[in-house]
Amino acid sequence: MPVLFMPQMHFHVAAITEMSSKLMSAGQYENVSLYPNVKMSVLDGLFEKCDFYLDINHEGEIVDAVHRAFLNNMLIVGYEETMHNAYYTADTNIFKESEYADMADALNMTLAMPYLIDEALAMQKKAAVAADATDYREILHL
C-alpha cells in the first residue's frame, strides 16, 4: 500500500459512495483519513486544502476530480493503468502500477525539497498548455 512508503504525507481518501472493506482497512494508518459517502462541501474543502491528487482509483472518475485538482493547483500523480484524464498530468508524474515504489520516491523527494513542487506544477501546466495571469498580461502587453 502506497501510504506505507510515505508516512510523512497525509492521505485524504474520499468516495461519494460506500467504500470497500479493503479500502476501509486503510483507515488503520495514522496518515489516512477516509470520507465514505462524502458530502460535496467536504470534498470542495479537500480540493482547496490538499497539495497533491493521486489518480489511482480503479473505478470511474467522479466529480471531474482530475480537472478540479488541476484548477486547484494540485500536483497530479497517477498510475498509467488508472488515469482518468491524462491531459492534466505531466508525463513525468505517470507511473505504471507496478512502479508504486518509484511513485512514492518521487513524492517523497518533492516533500523533502519543496521547490520541486513548483517545478512539477509548471511542467503540469505546460503539459496541459495552461495559461496563468502572467501569460495573459504578456499577451495583452500589460
Predicted segments, located by residue:
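Short acidic alpha-helix that forms the nucleotide-activated donor recognition element
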Residues: 39-51, 71
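Short glycine-rich donor-binding/catalytic loop of glycosyltransferases
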Residues: 58, 74, 78-88
